A protein has these predicted regions:
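N-terminal intrinsically disordered, cationic/polar leader segments
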Residues: 2-146, 150-183
């Protein structure tokens, strides 16, 4: 039995949930989300509680779906009430970011500025060297943050690049430090 999947999801006030077969729609103060789940999951709405189960819990694939489906629905509810955000730090001389309309424009040492268009329901705020990406869909927020980070991964010698706030970059000693150490 799935430890995560068997827990009930309590729906907070101000949030409406509609279940039509395998399709779950969640509407809240920050927006609305919709997701279709696998045919082996059974989602039941009882008043202000949602219970998730699977057709055959003894199979490994279904057990995996059980906990996943419950967490995805829980994240949908949290997204429309509180929202999600990821913070990225930019380190490097001349590296900067700015928001222009619905695009994030990054100067990362390339010959041209990199322009990324925000997906639906995603926004960003730039303060000095910190980019805060926020939205109601946890998957989209994480994916967009990962896309931005991939543009300039932190290098191990000086730590220049884009990293998540609080992420620790393993640093390497340069040639000069390594040569002095060997003598």
């Amino acid at each position: 039995m799935s430890r995560v999947g068997k827990q009930l999801i309590i729906i907070p006030s101000g949030v409406t949930v509609k279940i039509e077969g395998q399709k779950v729609s969640v509407k809240g103060p920050k927006g609305d989300l919709e997701k279709t789940f696998h045919s082996n999951t059974v989602i039941v709405l009882n008043g202000r509680e949602i219970s998730v189960s699977v057709k055959s819990p003894e199979e490994g694939f279904d057990r995996g779906l059980w906990g996943l489906s419950r967490v995805l629905i829980s994240n949908m509810i949290k997204g429309v009430t509180e929202g999600f955000s990821k913070k990225l730090e930019i380190a490097g001389i001349g590296f900067k970011a700015q928001v222009q309309g619905n695009k994030l424009v990054l100067s990362l040492g390339f010959s041209h500025p990199v322009k990324l268009e925000f997906p639906k329901n995603i926004s960003a705020v730039v303060e000095k060297n910190l980019i805060t990406i926020s939205g109601i869909d946890k998957e989209q927020v994480g994916q967009f943050a990962a896309t931005v980070k991939l543009l300039k991964k932190p290098e191990p010698y000086k730590g220049k690049g884009i990293k998540y706030q609080g992420e620790i970059i393993r640093r390497k000693a340069g040639k000069a430090a390594k040569a002095a150490e060997g003598k």
